[in-house]
Amino acid sequence: MPTATADRKLTAKDFQVPFPNDWCPGCGDFGILNAIQQAFAKLELEAHKVAVVGGIGCSGKAPYFFPTYGVHTLHGRLLPFAHGIKLANPEMTVVGVGGDGDGLGIGAGHFVNSGRRNLDMTYILFNNEVYGLTKGQAAPTLAMGLQPKSLPEPNIQGQLNSLMMAMSVGFTWIGRGYSYNVKKVVDLVVEAIQHPGLSFLDILQPCPTYNNLHTKDWYAGKDLNSGQPRIYWLDDTDYDPVIPPDADEAAALGKMNEFLSKVHELSLIHI
């Protein structure tokens, strides 16, 4: 396995494998995969000390594309597998990668209990609002009333807010990225892995095959008269999300209220 030396830095290519990839052209999964590979290189991780754990669906194939340890698990069960790996091998870097349907549908119970345990690992959610591998059914992240082309009728169920869920059940680092901005996602993955506790990274992504509503152009705001992108980056504002370890209760609650105000913004999407 390649390792960093004084004369050679690791690159994303060191975390790639020569296996064919059948994701659809334009799929956001490619950007997320590339960002994780770059993050591993930036952190100078040793491949034999990393485990990538996937669920089902398109994103569940991700572990096959790393020269690390990898597990392709059962529907909604990637987090228990990841917990077992971390508990048995505390020195390993464990990264869970799964879709919004996998993690917030049948896997929602494990999502909740993961927060309670707060193990030192990272969970990356591929959020495209549909079950891509099984022809585009509504995922728990799709808002009620929306009807992408894959649905015969508008979605009749309410939308789950993954960031709210993560905060309420105990994840200690929470972030959001956008798959078409790989550079930003690399930084988020690095920060999530470096966090000494349970980190959750929600990555918004288009599904060009089944979700014709929230496309690359939609995120870019090309349908708006203003032409303003729907995404903005908190790094470009004065928002400070960190709750210091010595913060008193009032200060911590103030930070949490700031977080809640960002999570519930409707006109723009914070990243």
Name these PLM-found stretches:
Residues M1-G132, D187:
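Thiamine diphosphate
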Residues D7, F15, D100, K222-N225, ...:
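Alpha-helical protein-protein interaction elements
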Residues W23-P25, G96-G98, W173-Y178:
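Short catalytic-loop micro-motif centered on adjacent basic/acidic residues
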Residues G26, F30, H72-G76, G105, ...:
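Conserved phosphate-coordination/catalytic loops
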Residues I106-M121, F126, V130-S267:
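Glycine-rich ThDP/TPP pyrophosphate-binding loop and its adjacent helix/strand module
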Residues I269-I271:
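Conserved small/polar residues in nucleotide/adenosyl-binding loops
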